[in-house]
Amino acid sequence: FLFSADAEPSLVNRKIMGSTPVKKANELNSIKEVEDVANKISGDLNKIGINYNFSPVVDMSPNKTVGYRSFGKNPENIIPWSNQFIQSTQANNIIATAKHFPGHGLVSGDTHKSLQVINGPLKEIKNYPPLIENGVLSIMVAHIAIENNENYSTQGLPSTCSKKVVTELLRDTLGFKGLIVTDAMNMGGVANVPKNASKAIAAGCDILLMPADARSAHSELLQLYLSNENEIQSSMNASVKRIIRMKICLGLL
């Protein structure tokens, strides 16, 4: 199985009892510290059987919800420090996850509570291509709508439920071939979207994180698969293959 955790430097000591004390992401002062923290966290995760870390946060820092969780105190550090965290994590046979695509750092509010909006250009997208090129294995998509953007407006839906963002931008334009996971599906930014499970999977996400009702989501996805045309079935089959390949690479199968 894939066992996951939000083991970010800024959250791990609160989330995992007995974990090795580490500095929060915004308190780190060098790329060497980033490497050391990633290795300490990964060592703890390996001891308890967690092989999928929803970290690092690669957003910019202005947003209060994610700012202290990212390396964005100095914008020039975001890409190299995130890459170091990713490489150190994956060297420990743990999947690393860059988040929150397409960018949570410059929106004003909290997607845990409600849908947030990027108005206009996607200024944080630039953080992702270098991480993709360097082999990050997973990317988490945020519950953020996009407005006034000619190519990627989401028509009021969160990015998690938008094929334009997940498939056309992340898969096709940026060329990401790894696992795409939603942010938690019980969050305020998506919970009130009707049939959000099937919308997220139809958009191209591979994994639904924490649906509010897992049984209902499973039934919804089964119905989606059985009642839709070949394009949806092909996309869902491809997601299953990506997950199986990842398990094989981790030595789980």
Which ranges hold each PLM region?
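Second-shell residues forming the walls of enzyme active-site clefts
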Residues: P80-E231
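Mid-to-C-terminal alpha-helical segments outside catalytic/metal-binding sites
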Residues: P211, Y225-L253
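A charged helix-plus-loop insertion that forms the helical arch/lid used to bind
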Residues: S19-I31
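Short glycine/serine-rich loop/turn segments
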Residues: Y52-G72, A96-L115
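Glycine-rich, aromatic-flanked loop segments that form ligand/cofactor-binding clefts
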Residues: F1-T20, V37-D59, I78-P102
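Glycine-rich anion/phosphate-binding loops
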Residues: L28-G43, P75-P80, G120-L122
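Hydrophobic face of alpha-helices
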Residues: A38, S82, H218, N237-V240
